[in-house]
Amino acid sequence: MTSNEWSSPDSPEGSSISGGSQALDKPIDNDAEGVWSPEIERSFQEALAIYPPCGRRKIILTEEGKMYGRNELIARHIKLRTGKTRTRKQVSSHIQVLARRKAREIQAKLKDQAAKNKALQSMAAMSSAQIVSATAFHSKMALARGPGYPAISGFWQGALPGQPGTSHDVKPFSQNTYPVQPPLPLPGFESPAGPTPSPSAPLAPPWQGRSIASSKLWMLEFSAFLERQQDPDTYNKHLFVHISQSSPSYSDPYLETVDIRQIYDKFPEKKGGLKELFERGPSNAFFLVKFWADLNTNIDDEGSAFYGVSSQYESPENMIITCSTKVCSFGKQVVEKVETEYARYENGHYLYRIHRSPLCEYMINFIHKLKHLPEKYMMNSVLENFTILQVVTNRDTQETLLCIAYVFEVSASEHGAQHHIYRLVKE
């Protein structure tokens, strides 16, 4: 790997985590309408549209600084809308009942046996939450159908008219509420009616549309860390931020989308800026990552401290990649580092690894100053105007392989760094 030093523009050059409200586990009210009255069912359906399936991960409500499981959030939504208490277990049981009902409806609706077998095979790999969830189910069945296969219309819907969308609770930013769109199916999976897909029809790899990946490059891992040597043989590593995408599956929901115009002012606008890059394309290479950084570590001992960044990528192609990382303040570039990485062939694909790349002095000082602020809201106020733009290109063709915009808050959890990934689109 070859690497340039950090330079200024003017220079020559996710586990299951306990949390949420204990009130959600209280016994149900003995309301006369029964456990799932029409009013409660409406609120339940609203919550399904608002909160996507998230597996064992937690959803962070930035207004409260708390993390909730999806069923907790659904129960919370029912309580807020109706005043009736439903437990997480009741929500889980209701989802399973609806999933079985939906599976039976789909079997009855599909006349073609091959299509029915394909749908059943697809549903077998899904959780009840994903079957019931509107967007996840639609995306999954689109993949099961393949190009040109009929959509199963009538079995999914978006957020109900007049109800809040996802952005009301799961937001990429704390101060400014940017519209978050539901996941979009990838090009090539279309509706309505068409023939059964050919067995030879190509299926997009599972990471496309579900993780930070374009058609030519997939980010496997990204981390920024502080490493200390405790003794000659022992190192202690603290992760400020971390992304791991090593094992996506077709059962994972598609990423939500954010209109890229909502974040133009947070990144450089001159030549080579985010706007120009997006106009040049390809459009499937652009992503937004909201980090909740973990600053819960002692950073005063500088003697043996190393601040670094590591990242790893995979591609079906052998090429030389260039990774540009721009640190921005109030939308203006402060420093930039450019690194070049060569491919290593392994198990039928090419790996690119940028290992222990040192953080610049500006970033180290920034972390120190941030850490010494007395309150988290002060840190978040500073971070609102701090962003990082990472652009990975093919060195020889200058094609954009990945463009990732990073925004930050401080994690309010004792369980470490958190993140949420969005696709950037232009509506």
UniProtKB/Swiss-Prot annotation:
Residues 7-21 have a biased composition (Low complexity). Residues 1-32, 163-206 are annotated as: Disordered. A motif (Nuclear localization signal) lies at residues 78-94. One of its GO terms (biological process) is embryo implantation. SMART domains: TEA. One of its GO terms (molecular function) is DNA binding. It is found in: Nucleus. Residues 194-205 have a biased composition (Pro residues). Induction: By FGF-1, FGF-2, calf serum, platelet-derived growth factor-BB, and phorbol 12-myristate 13-acetate. Its main location: nucleus. Preferentially expressed in lung and in skeletal muscle. Interacts with WWTR1/TAZ. Interacts with YAP1. Transcription factor which plays a key role in the Hippo signaling pathway, a pathway involved in organ size control and tumor suppression by restricting proliferation and promoting apoptosis. The core of this pathway is composed of a kinase cascade wherein MST1/MST2, in complex with its regulatory protein SAV1, phosphorylates and activates LATS1/2 in complex with its regulatory protein MOB1, which in turn phosphorylates and inactivates YAP1 oncoprotein and WWTR1/TAZ. This is Transcriptional enhancer factor TEF-3. It comes from Mus musculus. The gene is Tead4.
